[in-house]
Amino acid sequence: MDLNKEAFISEINRVFKMNGMASYLNVEKSEKFYLLTERMLTENEKYNLTAITEPNKIILNHYADCATLAAKLKKGASIVDVGCGAGFPTLPLALVRDDLKIVAMDSTAKRVNYVKETAEMLGLTNVTCIVSRAEDAGKDASMRECFDYATARAVAEMRTLCELCLPLVKVGGEMVAMKGKNAEFELAGAKRAISILGGGDVKVEDVVLKNGHDEPLSHPLISIKKRQKTPATYPRAFAQISKKPL
């Protein structure tokens, strides 16, 4: 599928409808997803944003996948997207849920600038972008335990990810990790980290998305409830997190 505007808009509406997410799109949002795709493909060589460049696969693997989070987030929630990279899930989520307040965080200034400029181009006033390491943000009083949710997509293995994300989540909030096929194994090894960092109940949901002509997209979505405050000693410096995971 070439990036033809009419064909793209038809395809994204078809795929969202097929996966029970038709209510997330309207004419304006469909056109903004087209503009997002156009910009991402144009800037891909400069920023190394995605290995997926076929529009139909972008719709399934990036847009529909990120939109699955929309139904799980309470109205008006504050979210920090840890390691936002190319803007996933930040940009699709901000498009389908304009009530959310999303902070896109990454340690790479070049990528943060791309996400910021793209959000501005799309008129997404509910996105704020910051250059920071998650372990530094977790020690910053203006961000520590301030968010309803922390999201992460393909950032790190679970023990490391918990130490980067849970300190940013307020008590009663949730960390939501979009993980790959090793998630259950990683999760089994992260029980101690979850407990130490203030996490509680863990929920694993299998996300399965289809478009009718490519292989279905299937991966686990892990939600961890924040039950108590994270001890002040966490998060540690990244060298310690990497060398001695909890």
Show where each model-derived region lies.
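Conserved SAM/SAH cofactor-binding pocket of Class I
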Residues: 64-156, 162
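Helix-to-beta-strand junctions that scaffold the AdoMet/dcAdoMet cofactor pocket
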Residues: 97, 169-171
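Short alpha-helix immediately C-terminal to the canonical SAM-binding loop
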Residues: 111-113, 183, 187
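Conserved beta-strand signature within the Rossmann-like core of class I S-adenosyl-L-methionine
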Residues: 172-182
